[in-house]
Regions:
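Peripheral interaction segments used for macromolecular assembly
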Residues: 1-77
Length: 77
């Protein structure tokens, strides 16, 4: 998978809850390994937050990015 295909992918936590979408990828320029991914969390139609995840917290990358941990996101009512 190329980075441009990775950006915009839906991210799920280990309980299959939608966490957000991949917004950016930071990688080590010497090794080429991904270090962190930045997620955009959409609370509602007008509010967005960002979250940074370590690459070690990713279980699977495919149709979805699945994390190996639970992420709690606050929702506004």
């Amino acid at each position: 998978m190329q980075i441009k295909e990775f950006i915009g992918s839906t991210v799920l936590d280990k309980n299959a809850n939608v966490v957000g979408k991949v917004d950016n990828v930071d990688f080590d320029t010497e090794t080429g390994k991904i270090e962190t991914i930045a997620l955009t969390l959409q609370k509602n139609i007008f509010t967005r937050d960002e979250l940074e995840i370590n690459f070690d917290d990713i279980q699977t990358i495919g149709a979805y990015v699945i994390l190996n941990k639970e992420i709690e996101t606050e929702t506004e009512e």
